[in-house]
Amino acid sequence: MVWYLSGLTCTHANVTEKGEFRSACAALGLIFVAPDTSPRGEGVPGDPANAYDFGLGAGFYVDATQQPFARNYRMWSYVTEELPKLVAENFPVDPGRQSILGHSMGGHGALTVALRHPDRYRAASAFAPIVAPSQVPWGIKALGGYLGDNKQAWRKHDTVALIEDGARASGLLVDYGDADPFLTEQLRPELLQAACEKAKIPLTLRRQPGYDHSYYFISTFMSDHLRWHAARLKA
């Protein structure tokens, strides 16, 4: 079973409509699970200024502690506890064979979830992930808005910080496009590379020439990631 966490502004439908995962999953015998990116519905608060990078479509895979978001924005618990339980109760899955990947904000979510649950996920990969949210504008806004000013709480949702604090993985696969407009300000893959080198975590970091941040990029390399996951899930 492969979990896929989507990025800012997305719902589950972005990857289910544009992700090009079906053929590879069918051939590899994988179940593909794609959660939403935030709570939805009447009464769920969004960004006060209706910005795209906070609130609806931008849950950042944390359990909010700040009001008015704490009641609804519990995306960490949703993707690590509530939804896995629901899936296991209703589908023929093997809980001992799970892996996780994601894009952008979802890449951040996938990597942090995997690092904090190393015994649950056999593989983790990401497309253009936000690897150090504590150090970039998207992450500073989201972590501050959901978790408040406690920077120690932020570190639990920051891939680079988790690695610095001792979290480990057997290996990571990360792709990014060198034409991604968010590369230098928001994504900063060089920080992940440095952290993994220092911690001796095997990292395959691939720079894809000419690709941007879009689903053209994701769909091109999705089957490659799924084959990488399948090899580890079936080992």
What would you call each of these model-derived segments?
Residues M1-A235:
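Non-catalytic cap/lid and distal C-terminal segments of serine-dependent acyl enzymes
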